[in-house]
């Protein structure tokens, strides 16, 4: 059984590819997790086959610092977590007044230490994201946690809130926005900082790897372009693509939802496609 934990994904500097969460019943019994694998060791296994995981449970409730410390201890060097911020913050009627709640959340999740990546602030469809409130909220986001740079990403699911003014605002605050490849949510790949965060939501149940091989190769090419500082014009944008950056961008890509049972295979196949490119 210990041989199950000897694997490691390809090392890709500045590129992190993964899945949403690690607790999912259909992944057991051979779909992703080997038969007989103890549930308490699923994170340990998953983190040796993908290079990042987006924590979804924190959207519903923040965890205890001890829980974050346990997760940190189970993953290998170089592995990164991103995490959704609690919805009690992002659904607040007074978004610009959530400073204490933000501090509490960040103070706890900072226990992830070197494994802590971006924090994702998800605003659901129907939430009225007023410009003034968003301005105040962005000013509250801490830029460091325990001496380490802390990155923030907005996922805006209401199309009415996605416009040029929003894009200009996040650029001023150097906060990223999620590029969501989905038929359901707003899909825009405009870049606002040196961080790229993509959620791919089109996996197909009939395909072993979730995506056709040509589609994975196209995503590998986009990811490599992002990493080089480019802004792929083939992806949907609100405005003209950004000029090529002077420095590389940090890239996070997660397979989320859709045919979720196939997402680990999709992530592993994409890692191999990037490494081969």
Model segments located where?
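Residues lining hydrophobic/aromatic ligand-binding pockets adjacent to catalytic sites
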Residues: 1-277
């Amino acid at each position: 059984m210990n041989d199950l934990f000897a694997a490691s994904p390809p090392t890709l500097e500045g590129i992190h590819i993964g899945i949403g969460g690690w607790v999912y019943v259909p992944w057991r019994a051979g779909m992703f997790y080997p038969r007989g694998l103890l549930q308490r060791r699923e994170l340990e296994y998953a983190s040796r086959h993908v290079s990042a995981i987006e924590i979804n449970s924190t959207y519903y409730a923040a965890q205890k610092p001890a829980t974050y410390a346990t997760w940190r201890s189970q993953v290998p060097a170089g592995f990164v977590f991103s995490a959704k911020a609690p919805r009690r913050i992002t659904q607040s009627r007074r978004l610009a007044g959530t400073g204490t709640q933000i501090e509490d959340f960040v103070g706890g999740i900072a226990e992830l230490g070197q494994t802590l990546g971006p924090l994702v602030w998800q605003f659901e469809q129907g939430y009225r994201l007023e410009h003034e409130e968003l301005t105040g909220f962005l000013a509250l986001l801490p830029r460091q946690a325990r001496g380490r740079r802390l990155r923030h990403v907005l996922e805006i699911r209401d199309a009415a809130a996605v416009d040029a003014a929003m894009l200009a605002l996040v650029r001023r605050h150097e906060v990223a926005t999620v590029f969501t490849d989905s038929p359901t949510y707003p899909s825009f790949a405009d870049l606002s900082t040196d961080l790229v965060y993509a959620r791919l939501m089109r996996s197909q149940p009939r395909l072993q790897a979730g995506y056709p091989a040509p589609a994975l190769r196209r995503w590998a090419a986009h990811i490599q372009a992002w990493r080089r500082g480019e802004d792929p014009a083939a992806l949907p944008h609100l405005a003209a693509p950004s000029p090529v950056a002077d420095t590389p961008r940090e890239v996070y890509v997660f397979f989320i939802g859709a045919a979720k049972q196939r997402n680990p295979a999709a992530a592993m196949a994409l890692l191999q496609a990037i490494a081969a490119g």
